[in-house]
């Protein structure tokens, strides 16, 4: 009787191992990154391989997915594009200067979601959505376009420099906030090509 129990237990263990091991050997869905992006409301991991095609292979996106650093933050060519993307995708709810309308203001140091003080958190909110009318924008903006939009939002910031955690010390010293009427030239040199017109 004891041998039958041992054999049964061993067979059960082998069966479970046979089921579990192939599942463990399967590749994970989506690209593996150094940063885990989480839904702003639920905390669930976001699959950044989903959404609008393109805009995932730029050096800036690769760096951001690995480190959470947005290389576009102070690049004039990316600010130019971010302004246009923000105007079409965000300003209807957040205001032309991110001062807030139906949605909260994004240009001061009060954040409805504290995670949005970081570029990783703001990216996750744009990508996966939040409460209320803030739906996910991963179907109408690529990750590269999201980074350009974030750069523009950060450029509109009017709060104290010390609260701008997305800027490093060198960037804080050089930071010049947006001045109404400021125009960034279409031919501004930098990492971002002009958007298709």
From Swiss-Prot:
The keyword Transport applies. Gene3D superfamilies: Cytochrome c-like domain (1.10.760.10). GO terms for molecular function: electron transfer activity; heme binding; iron ion binding. It is found in: Periplasm. Heme c binds at residues 90, 93-94. Residues 1-25 form the signal peptide. Keywords: Electron transport, Heme, Iron, Metal-binding, Methanol utilization, Periplasm, Signal, Transport. One of its GO terms (biological process) is methanol metabolic process. Binds 1 heme c group covalently per subunit. It holds the Pfam family Cytochrome_CBB3. GO terms for cellular component: periplasmic space. Electron acceptor for MDH. Acts in methanol oxidation. This is Cytochrome c-L. It comes from Methylorubrum extorquens (strain ATCC 14718 / DSM 1338 / JCM 2805 / NCIMB 9133 / AM1) (Methylobacterium extorquens).
């Amino acid at each position: 009787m004891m041998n039958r129990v041992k054999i049964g237990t061993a067979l059960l263990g082998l069966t479970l191992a046979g089921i579990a091991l192939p599942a463990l050997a399967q590749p994970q869905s989506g690209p593996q990154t150094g940063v885990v992006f989480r839904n702003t409301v639920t905390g669930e991991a976001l699959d950044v391989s989903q959404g609008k095609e393109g805009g995932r292979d730029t050096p800036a996106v690769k760096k951001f997915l690995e480190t959470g650093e947005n290389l576009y933050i102070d690049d004039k060519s990316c600010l130019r594009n971010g302004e246009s993307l923000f105007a079409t995708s965000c300003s209807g709810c957040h205001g032309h200067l991110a001062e807030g309308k139906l949605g909260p203001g994004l240009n001061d140091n009060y954040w409805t979601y504290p995670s949005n003080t970081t570029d990783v958190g703001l990216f996750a909110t744009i990508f996966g959505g939040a409460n209320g009318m803030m739906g996910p924008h991963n179907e109408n903006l690529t990750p590269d376009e999201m980074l350009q939009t974030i750069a523009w939002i950060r450029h509109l910031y009017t709060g104290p420099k010390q609260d701008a955690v997305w800027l490093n010390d060198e960037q804080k010293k050089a930071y010049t906030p947006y001045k109404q009427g400021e125009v960034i030239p279409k031919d501004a040199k930098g990492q971002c090509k002009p958007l298709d017109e």
